[in-house]
Curated annotation (Swiss-Prot):
Record-given protein name: UDP-N-acetylenolpyruvoylglucosamine reductase
A GO MF label: UDP-N-acetylmuramate dehydrogenase activity
Classification of source organism: Bacteria, Bacillati, Actinomycetota, Actinomycetes, Mycobacteriales
NCBIfam families, alphabetized: murB, PRK13903.1
Subcellular location: Cytoplasm
Length: 363
């Protein structure tokens, strides 16, 4: 095994993956190689790719759903965690905890990442998904991303234009041929927050949408909002809050045409469901997936006590493991919710996490 000759790499056999994901579900991997430096990560990936070995690349485990039967595989654990600051630039290795990146930037008086506080997972995952929350996304501040192309072995920095960021996506999302090694962010050296675009957050801060304010105040407000929705990972193993055992929002907010939006408005009006929350989007109108889920009949906590997988009791868009769920349980619940929204509103929701070895069936 060529990878075993990469100095310092920890190799373990028969590794349960459930504790390494925020959903707390996963198979037992045949073996896992943990890379604590970028050099180790490059060496291992080059060696295993040359061996043509099937791999699972895992870092924070916060936005991935692993099939129950993915057992005969090798996992490469990304655990390089260095964060460096140079002027208004912050560089984070792929395995750094995302919230540590946010905290480090604020400690150096840099604004721009505060709206993304409390998001679980690693820095390397953020450009893959174009992670976002409360009116901000990492594409707003990323300046470049260091990548390893497993097909050629090339290690280089890619521009934001090459990454083709979109709503919760990038060119990196649907392939593991290119692996993120480091991410660089360009932030506000004047210590101002990013413009507060999200109405709920602006209200909590007492500012007008579009205003800037103290980024530490923004972080505090975001953490309060996220905690109230069960969207901050609970670290207490003895008294876990199962509402936090999730991948966050399971579905993205759909962007629809103006004609489809008017149709959804008519359906909601006829059902007495009230005004439809909506936001302008470059290609149409963005709808609130959580609102669609609840108005389609799937309230918080659905399907109720005793279910191994259910919607969070705090946030209808989070599908949660209540302690004993399997991936099959979660995917069945996701399929039921997706089919219900399609039936009521004619809108097909798109899953946000990466699904490995499991498929969300088309209703």
């Amino acid at each position: 095994m060529a990878s075993s000759h990469v100095a310092g790499v920890e190799i373990a056999e028969a590794v349960p993956l459930a504790p390494l994901t925020t959903l707390r579900i996963g198979p037992v991997a045949r073996r896992m190689l943990t890379c604590t430096s970028t050099e180790q990560l490059i060496g291992v990936l080059r060696a295993l790719t040359a061996d043509d070995e099937p791999l699972l690349i895992l870092a924070g485990g916060s936005n991935v759903v692993l099939a129950d039967d993915l057992t005969d595989l090798t996992v490469v654990r990304i655990a390089n965690t260095e964060i460096t600051v140079d002027g208004d630039r912050v560089r984070a290795e792929a395995g750094a905890l995302w919230d540590d990146v946010v905290v480090t930037s604020l400690a150096h008086g840099l604004g721009g990442l505060e709206c993304l506080s409390g998001i679980p997972g690693s820095a390397g995952a953020t450009p893959v998904q174009n992670v976002g929350a409360y009116g901000a996304e990492v594409a707003d501040t990323i300046t470049r991303v260091r990548l390893l192309d497993r097909r050629t072995g090339e290690d280089r920095w890619a521009t934001t234009e090459e990454l083709r960021f979109g709503y919760r996506t990038s060119v990196l999302k649907h392939s593991d041929a290119v692996i993120v090694l480091e991410v660089e962010f360009g932030l506000d050296a004047a210590g101002r927050s990013a413009p507060v675009r999200y109405r709920e957050l602006a209200t909590a801060l007492g500012v007008e949408p579009g205003e800037r304010t103290d980024p530490l105040r923004v972080r505090d407000a975001v953490l309060r909002l996220r905690t109230g929705k069960g969207m901050v990972v609970d670290p207490d193993p003895d008294h876990p809050d199962h509402d936090t055992w999730s991948v966050g929002s399971f579905f993205t907010n759909p962007v629809v045409t103006h004609a489809d939006f008017e149709r959804v408005e008519r359906i909601a009006r006829d059902a007495g469901a009230g005004p439809v929350p909506n936001y302008p989007a470059p290609d149409g109108v963005k709808l609130a997936a959580g609102w669609l889920v609840e108005r389609a009949g799937f309230g918080k906590g659905y399907p109720g006590e005793g279910a191994r997988a259910r919607l969070s009791t705090k946030h209808a868009l989070a599908l949660t493991n209540r302690g004993q769920a399997t991936t099959a349980d979660v995917m069945a619940l996701a399929g039921t919710v997706r089919a219900g929204v399609l039936d009521v509103f004619g809108i097909e929701l798109t899953p946000e996490p990466i699904l490995l070895g499991c498929v969300l069936s088309v209703p």
